[in-house]
Design a protein with these regions (language model features):
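DNA replication sliding-clamp ring fold and its partner-interaction surfaces
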Residues: 1, 61-64, 68
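Flexible "stalk/tail and boundary" regions
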Residues: 7-53, 58, 67-125
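Short, small-residue-biased leader/transition segments that mark boundaries at the very start
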Residues: 2-6
């Protein structure tokens, strides 16, 4: 359930983080960055400054501020895409376009997983 959500803009979409995931992600990023490196501190500052706690109303809805919609180029219809433990909110016209063409996708999969021996545990199916 989405008790509190923290949206940030990332790659032309809004990403909603459940509060517990947000704090874990923020901590993970903080641990990877050098606080004495000005550029890395600016990255962290930008990441956390875009977040805002949003609590659903009695019907489970959240109202996204206009500035978030404008930042993501959302004018009317949206598409929700569940990615791991976050929810991405895209302008429908952007999300209806392929994120990668089939050749790029195939090449990326081969690059990432081509040397892996991926199999599944039949007992878990």
């Amino acid at each position: 359930s989405l008790h509190d959500a923290l949206p940030i803009l990332y790659q032309d979409c809004l990403v909603l983080y459940p509060e517990s995931v947000w704090f874990a992600t923020q901590n993970q990023l903080r641990c990877r960055l050098n606080k004495w490196n000005a550029k890395q501190q600016m990255i962290f500052r930008q990441f956390v400054s875009d977040a805002e706690v949003m609590t659903p109303d009695g019907n489970g809805r959240i109202l996204l501020p206009k500035r978030y919609l404008q930042m993501a180029g959302i004018q009317s219809d949206v598409r929700f895409i569940g990615v791991d433990n976050t929810i991405e909110i895209w302008a429908k016209e952007r999300a209806d376009q392929p994120f990668m063409n089939p050749d790029e996708f195939s090449e990326a999969l081969e690059e990432l997983l081509g040397d892996e021996n991926i199999c599944c545990d039949e007992n878990k199916l």
